[in-house]
Amino acid sequence: MGYTANGLINRPILASIHTEAFQHNLNRVRELAPESKIWSVIKARAYGHAFEAALKGLGSTDGFALLDIQDAVWLREHGWQGRILLLEGLFHENELELAQELACDLVVHCDAQVDWLETFKAKNHNKFNVFLKMNTGMNRLGFKPDAYRTAFHRLHSAGYQVHHMTHFANADQVGHEPSVGGQQELFNQTISGLPGSTSLANSAAILWHRNALGDWVRPGIMLYGASPTGLYADIAHSHLKAVMQLSSEIIDIQELKKGDRVGYGGRYEAQESMRIGIVACGYADGYPRQAKDGTPVWVNKGA
């Protein structure tokens, strides 16, 4: 990132965040899921894009979804009055009072969290909205289907408003197991007859599985203008706009002969005599050293 000293930028590299692209991508979610409400996922300080920019660009969302309760504190302190979902719930029982004060919705994914909420409800009259997470095949967080209904009834009996959530493992891939259809079928069978809204779809499901959206969608990567597949064609076809723009300057030029090599390990070999530009940007700036060759670069703003 560029920084200032005595009014000058010492290095020309700069990451620019375009909040209007945030709004464009959020509108795209609304076009694809017009009947669903939106949890905009901004975990890890909006994936490095800064909460300030996310709050400005995504301020028309129905709710923000994040990981750390201290990030929920930040949102409230900066004027966000809408809903906040803690995607992994609480990590410690002593966070319950703060979560209640902040009016957070909680994901519940394990027995310990159910225990905490039962104990808390016995001592307090206020209620949380709870999204009970089902493990339908991703095998990360959530109750297996055979334990899910028991957890639901415990929370429901304690007086909580309980909603239903799962997460797709392969919404961005065809022919991989578990499939979106298989996970969705298992989810629907398990919650049959239970009250509460549903939340299933991540970015990939919003883009390519619009029969699996649910009442609340949870876009993450697509809000930032990237595709879940990592393919530029999918970004273009989905009409997304990149929120972050990385720019720098060419600070030197090297003249190469055929056979000269460039970079660590000599990974690029000149096939003919050529000139190459050296850009002020490297992995110390956050650009991955393992990034593949061939990344498109615009010189002189694409002129």
Regions found by a protein language model. Give the residues of each.
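Short conserved beta-strand and strand-loop elements enriched in small hydrophobics
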Residues: 294-300
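Structural motif
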Residues: 36-39, 62-63, 83-85, 105, ...
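Active-site loop/helix belt of alpha/beta enzymes
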Residues: 10, 44-59, 102, 114-129, ...
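Functionally critical, mid-to-C-terminal surface segments that flank or help form catalytic/ligand
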Residues: 243-293
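Short, surface-exposed ligand-recognition loops at beta-strand->loop->(often short) alpha-helix junctions
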Residues: 17, 146-147, 285-288
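Electropositive phosphate-/nucleotide-binding environments in soluble metabolic enzymes
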Residues: 16-23, 48, 52, 66-69, ...
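A charged N-terminal "starter" segment
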Residues: 1-105, 111, 118-119, 127
